[in-house]
């Protein structure tokens, strides 16, 4: 039995969790900063870092209390050390280093993107390797071939804006509240996704990269020409914009799966909480015999520490250890 405490502070959530054997979350605590950043329309790095300083130890204490596991029952401390906002990452890294030293436990640094890729192992029915992983968030839109824990190969990524960024910037153009992706998803449920024709948000050719800047520009031109609509017309605009983003993600992911002969697709990252993306990916998988799609529960799509504990557990079992010189790496590539 392996029990790992993990800390996650890469952006605007302060999170801690205790996970057993990389499969069972004994606790999973998240302190969100949405209300703090809402007035600014997005995450303010300095405010995020300051709030992490205030919240990190209370969140860790709550995670330990909920799990019923004390420091003596832990096998290691894992922490997100990149990528992310450098100031935010440093808070979590310093806290984890201090706790590991005080408790005499091994320390493991975890890549945030790997955490997303393995979050599905906390679900009731986990995937099996190998699988194709689509990580979609505010800062990343990437396709990975996952052959085992710690064994990933980048297949394609966005050349400009991430899908989550396209949602958030689009929401700002429409005057919608932060977080923008959630607002668009909510309004789109009442709209017609075919009401407005947006350009395909894909890169031409056979490669597996993404591009969303043109789609965002198309929305800007539409708003400049027609203004921001209200009521049903706004719902139609949100649904059409969302559909263009989702279509690009699903088409690229399934193109990669067919070409590389993957039978399993795992959706991960905050945008994987989008209801239309979840439905579209599930529907597309049903069209292909032998193809399965794995989508974690919504709470495991957004930033959390349980997924970091899963990755940390398997890194620990591989013999990986971080020293006292572990530092934040905001540009750490998986």
Swiss-Prot record:
- EC annotation? 2.3.1.234
Give its localization: Cytoplasm
Name the record gives this protein: tRNA N6-adenosine threonylcarbamoyltransferase
* Keywords linked to the UniProt accession: Acyltransferase, Cytoplasm, Iron, Metal-binding, Transferase, tRNA processing
Binding positions for substrate per the UniProt entry: 135-139, 168, 181, 185, 274
Q: Give binding positions for Fe cation.
A: 112, 116, 303
Keyword Glycoprotein included in the entry's annotation: no
Do you know which HAMAP family this protein is assigned to? TsaD (MF_01445)
What organism, scientifically named, is this protein from?
Anaeromyxobacter dehalogenans (strain 2CP-C)
């Amino acid at each position: 039995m392996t029990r790992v405490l993990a800390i996650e502070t890469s952006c605007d959530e302060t999170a801690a969790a205790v996970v057993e054997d990389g499969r069972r979350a004994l606790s999973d605590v998240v302190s969100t900063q949405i209300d703090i950043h809402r007035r600014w329309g997005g995450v303010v790095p300095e405010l995020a870092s300051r709030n992490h300083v205030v919240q990190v130890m209370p969140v860790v204490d709550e995670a330990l209390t909920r799990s019923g596991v004390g420091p003596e029952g832990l096998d290691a401390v894992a922490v997100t050390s990149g990528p992310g906002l450098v100031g935010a990452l440093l808070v979590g890294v310093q806290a984890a280093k201090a706790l590991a030293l005080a408790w005499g436990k091994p320390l493991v640094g975890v890549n945030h993107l790997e955490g997303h890729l393995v979050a599905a192992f906390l679900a009731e029915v986990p995937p099996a390797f190998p699988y194709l992983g689509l990580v979609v968030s505010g800062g990343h839109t990437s396709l990975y071939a996952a052959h085992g824990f710690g064994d990933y190969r980048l297949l394609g990524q966005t050349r400009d804006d991430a899908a989550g960024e396209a949602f958030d910037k689009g929401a700002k153009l429409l005057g919608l509240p932060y977080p923008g992706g959630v607002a668009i998803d909510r309004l789109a449920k009442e709209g017609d996704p075919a009401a407005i024709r947006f350009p395909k948000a894909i890169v031409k050719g056979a490669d597996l990269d993404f591009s969303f800047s043109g789609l965002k520009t198309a929305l800007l031109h539409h708003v400049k020409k027609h203004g921001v609509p209200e009521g049903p017309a706004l719902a139609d605009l949100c649904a059409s914009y969302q559909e263009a983003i989702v279509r690009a993600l699903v088409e690229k992911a399934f193109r990669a799966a067919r070409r590389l002969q993957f039978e399993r697709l795992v959706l991960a990252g905050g945008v994987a909480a989008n209801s239309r993306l979840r439905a579209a990916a599930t529907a597309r998988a049903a069209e292909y015999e032998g193809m399965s799609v794995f989508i974690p529960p919504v709470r495991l799509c957004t930033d959390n520490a349980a997924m970091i504990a899963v990755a940390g557990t398997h890194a620990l079992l591989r013999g990986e250890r971080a020293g006292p010189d572990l530092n934040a790496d905001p540009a750490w590539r998986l």
